[in-house]
């Protein structure tokens, strides 16, 4: 069987993250929300808080693991995209918000649980 493409593997990781977060009580507001500033993998609601979730998948940790791939530049793009989301979806603008990261690593995640970091970074 052929290996999954990086795009397909990333989509599978997003689906796994979404299902996990929904199981934790979060509600999906948007998936793969795109704008000029970038893309938000998942936008979810946790009680009254709008949660911008970046899903990171890495097959190997050779160049740094999934969590290590969220550098300052990526954080700035996420903050910009989140700001644009809140402008466009103004009814969410008065809600508190946070940035979470869900990280998965390994082929079929090698039996490892995903890592969910709430408030992964400040904006």
Curated annotation (Swiss-Prot):
Pfam family, one: UPF0102
A molecular-function term among this protein's GO annotations: nucleic acid binding
Residues annotated as transmembrane: none
Protein name according to UniProt: UPF0102 protein Pput_4400
Taxonomy, superkingdom: Bacteria
Species name: Pseudomonas putida (strain ATCC 700007 / DSM 6899 / JCM 31910 / BCRC 17059 / LMG 24140 / F1)
Family membership noted in the UniProt record: Belongs to the UPF0102 family.
Record-linked InterPro entries: Restrct_endonuc-II-like (IPR011335), tRNA_endonuc-like_dom_sf (IPR011856), UPF0102_YraN-like (IPR003509)
Cited NCBIfam families: PRK12497.1-3 (NF009150), YraN family protein (TIGR00252)
């Amino acid at each position: 069987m052929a290996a999954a493409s990086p795009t397909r593997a990333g989509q599978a990781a997003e689906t796994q993250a979404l299902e996990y977060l929904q199981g934790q009580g979060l509600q999906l507001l948007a998936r793969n929300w795109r704008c000029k500033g970038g893309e938000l993998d998942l936008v979810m609601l946790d009680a009254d808080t709008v949660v911008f979730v970046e899903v990171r998948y890495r097959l190997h940790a050779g160049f740094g693991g999934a969590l290590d791939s969220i550098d300052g530049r990526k954080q700035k793009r996420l903050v910009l995209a989140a700001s644009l989301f809140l402008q466009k979806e103004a009814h969410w603008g008065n809600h508190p918000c946070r940035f979470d990261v869900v990280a998965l690593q390994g082929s079929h995640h090698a039996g490892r649980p995903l890592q969910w970091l709430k408030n992964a970074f400040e904006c």
